[in-house]
Amino acid sequence: MRIVFMGTPEFAVPALQVLVNYSAIEVVGVVTQPDRPVGRKRLLTPTPVKEEAIKHGIPVLQPEKLRRPESVEELRELQPDLIVTAAYGQILPKSVLAIPRLGCINIHASLLPRYRGGAPIHHAVMNGDTSTGVTIMYMAEGLDTGDMISSVELAIGDSDTTGTMFNKLSAAGAQLLLDTLPDLLAGSIQAVAQNHEAAVYSPNVSREQERIDWSRPAVSLWNQVRGLNPRPGAYTTWNGEVLKIWSCDKPNQSDVANTPGTVVAISEQGILVATGAG
C-alpha cells in the first residue's frame, strides 16, 4: 500500500516510524510545514518530521498552503492509497481529501468529540481532566468531525504537564496506529460517527489564557501552570516585569486569608502566594 504521511512536530515522528517499519506499506512521500527560523539566531530549521523522513530517504513536500493547485497536483502525482496525518498544522481541503482511494485518516490527541482543534492536550490539563486519549478517525471537511476508527484512553496524573502528556500521547498514538493498520489494510474497519452535539473545542492558547489571575481558585491555577508547561508558560508580573511560572505544588486546604496575589511566605521550597480559594 502506498501511503503519504503528513505531520510536523515531534508528536508525529513515532507514527511515521511505525509506517516506515510496516512491511506492507511504502511511504511514498511526507508532507510537513516549511522550515522556520528558530532560536535567538533565527536559524532556518527543518521540522522533526522532515528530519525523520530524510533519514529514510523519503521525498518531502513543504507547501506554504496545501490548497494551492500546484500543491494538490504534487500530492496526486504520488498516487497514495491512503493519507495519514498527525499534527500536520493545516486543514486538508476537499481536493486533497479526494485523492487517496482509501481516504485520509488522522491521529488526534483527544477522545473525540471532546477537544476538537489545535490544542487538545493543553486544554485537557488546564481544565483539570483526569484522563484524555488518542483517536484515529477518517478526515472530513469539518474540523476533526470525521467518523472514529479507534481510540485509547490515558490517565492524567497530578505530576503530569502538557509536556509529559505530549510524549505519552505521541507514543500511544503510534501504538494505536500499529494496532489499527491490519484492519485498515484488510478493509474491515467499522467506523463510528461522532456525537456532534457533545463536541468541545480546543483552540490554540491565547495570551490572555497564559496570564495568572490570582483571584481564581488555587486548584484552577495549579492546572493552568501544568497545562502551559513547557510551552508557552503561565505568567504573572512583578514590579512591571513578566515572570514565567513553570511549576507549583498541588494546593491543599489553607486558612490563610490574604488578598489574592499577596506573597505570604518565601522559603527554600518556593514562594507561597494567596489565591482566590486556598
Segments from the language model and where they lie:
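Donor/substrate-binding cores of folate-linked one-carbon enzymes
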Residues: 82-201
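Residue-level detector of anion-binding/catalytic polar loops
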Residues: 59, 131, 242
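N-terminal Rossmann-like dinucleotide-binding module
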Residues: 1-41
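An anion-binding loop in the catalytic cleft
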Residues: 21, 32, 215-278
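Acyl-group handling in specialized metabolite and lipid biosynthesis
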Residues: 203-216
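Internal alpha/beta domain cores that form substrate/cofactor-binding pockets in large enzymes
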Residues: 2-4, 27-31, 55-78, 83-85, ...
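N-terminal beta-loop-helix "entrance" segment that forms/cooperates
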Residues: 36-56
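Structural motif corresponding to alpha-helix initiation and N-cap regions
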Residues: 13, 43-46, 68-72, 118
